[in-house]
Amino acid sequence: MQNPPQHPEAQSPETRDREFFITAAIDYANGTPHIGHVYEKILADAIARYQRLAGRDVTFVMGTDEHGEKISKAAAKGGVTPQELVDDLSERAFQGLWKKLGISYDFFIRTTSAKHKKYVQDVLQRVYDAGDIYFAEYEGLYSVGAERYVTEKELVEGPDGVRRFPGDKDPPELRREANYFFNMQKYQPWLLETLQQNPDLIQPAGYRNEVLEMLKEDIGPLSISRPKARVPWGIELPWDTDHVTYVWFDALLSYLTPLVSQGQDASMSGKAWHVIGKDILKPHAVFWPTMLRAAGLPLYRRLVVHSHILAEDGRKMGKSLGNAIDPEELVAAWPVDAIRYALLREASLGADSPFGEGVLVSRLNSDLANDLGNLLSRTVSMIQKYRGGVIPAATEPTDREREIEAAARALPDEVLRLVDELKINMAIDAAMSFVRDLNRYIAESTPWTLAKSPETQGRLDTVLYTAAEGLRVASVALEAVIPTKAKELREQLGLGRQGYPLQAAWGLTPAGTRVQGGAILFPKPEPKADETKNAEAKPPKPQAKKEKKTVTDTAPAKTTEQKPEAAAPAQNDGLISIDDFAKIDLRIAEVVACEAVEKADKLLKLTVKLGDETRTVVSGIRKWYEPEALVGRKVVLVANLKPAKLRGIESQGMILAAEDDAGNLDLVGTELDLPSGTKVR
């Protein structure tokens, strides 16, 4: 037996192949796309975009699978021909949605196209001539949903006690049929050895282990045809026109059709990254490799398997459950780049991931609006205010600027390494950590203070340039995820729509560039109508009636003087007296330690020094500040606030902060370095 090919994966950018071939699963055109389709295509698109930014020649293939029994039934039910049905679904429902989501595929293959039919028949004839396809009669359990024969072991018992193939509404049918079969088990030893020698071939590793378990038993032959008299909607076998090829040699070969039809070598299959859902693992991990082997083509480079998207409450999503997300409604209601960001940031390949409006709004507000959008607004605004809209040159760099430059130069390799490891969410977080550090840098540098003194103008220039160039670097690191907004960000910086490679670089923003400004990059969503109803719309709470005292016959009533009625209290105008204000004890406090509160996205636990006293304060400023950035900072504390427990931690005061309409937040402090415990009055 020939040794299986090796598939080295974690290659450095210098040793990677220049060519990069990626596919997303070919979608079955018998219904409209769901949120799982959306996630998969955004995932594959982000990987493709990252590789383009890294300078690789990318070929990205998608398409629709348009033959089969289910399509014939759906067309008959709708009163149209199968071709009319797939034309509508492929062009309107699928390609239309991918365009709205910014999916940057290079080829979109339809399996009803003439070029695809020709390639399928060419490969079938080649495998048939080699003796790996034969005619036989077979009886077994057939899943209409999966469009293949299944084994008893693959069935799962439902709540009603009926065993079904996962995802099917109906139990499998017992079918006996004479079809053509592919001698798949011939290549089982080769496939097993290949998987054992290439641990990164199928990722995440848990899915590779599933396939290894499958290969412990005889995989048997694969039925690849149906009688044309029963299923006429398919590609005829070139040696027997009474049969059509069914599913596998049709759908899976669609990954290669665009290459072959463009005159490229089908051996590009050996460079492919296939991105698929876990529900079609077996066809891609067992059927497809053995088909490639029989056709004399190299095995793909990597099979990327993603899990399912769940409802926000962790339940499975479905129309029957009333919690399905309509992708068309989603893109109509929310910014596309926010959808892309939230799905990629929240989901991880190895586990089913919850998603919904709450998740989307949280990421939109905290990451995109507060962190990235506000950084852009602040930077552009300060350049306009302090430098007439022109980005100055950095003239007085300190260790802090050199630290930011080093982080910026290291970021591209870190992002690409994480993408190669399929940790897309972590790659995004690496870029956003850089953004958050830029926000801390501005807060630490206080450019608004530097602007006041002639002696610190050079320092101000350096801070403004560092912020602008840092934003450019961040935009490139995030461009694969938020492609439209990344370009808009650079336009606001005055850099036009010029593209930049994802590589270690600093100083590519020319000093003297005039910023353009523009609309808020990621506006925060307006509250829903039912969230904005004020208390006046609610009926007043009923007042408790005072119990009336009665006078008994045995107790003489007392006579009392009639007191004049008290004057009506003046209407509350929101003002307080100086005496009221004097009750508030405001003090300077120094942060000596800070940490995030577990399982609380918004809270930080601060240990502050108040003169000789040490206190614990819990504050909801986590989305603006990293814990380590606050250590050593002096803040204003409400020192005589009644203690309150937050997440089981007693908070002994309140830190004062100011937030503008754009969501920029700054802690209240003093220009002088006053001792902790100093009273504010």
From Swiss-Prot:
Keywords: Aminoacyl-tRNA synthetase, ATP-binding, Cytoplasm, Ligase, Nucleotide-binding, Protein biosynthesis, RNA-binding, tRNA-binding
Binding-site list for ATP: K319
Molecular function as annotated in GO: ATP binding; methionine-tRNA ligase activity; tRNA binding
Biased composition (Basic and acidic residues): 525-539
GO cellular component: cytoplasm
Lineage: superkingdom: Bacteria
EC assignment: 6.1.1.10
GO BP term, pick one: methionyl-tRNA aminoacylation
Residues in tRNA-binding domain copies: 580-681
Predominant place of localization: cytoplasm
Functional summary from the UniProt entry: Is required not only for elongation of protein synthesis but also for the initiation of all mRNA translation through initiator tRNA(fMet) aminoacylation.
Family that this chain belongs to: Belongs to the class-I aminoacyl-tRNA synthetase family. MetG type 2B subfamily.
Subunit relationships: Homodimer.
Name assigned to this protein: Methionine--tRNA ligase
Native source organism of the sequence: Deinococcus radiodurans (strain ATCC 13939 / DSM 20539 / JCM 16871 / CCUG 27074 / LMG 4051 / NBRC 15346 / NCIMB 9279 / VKM B-1422 / R1)
Gene for this chain: metG
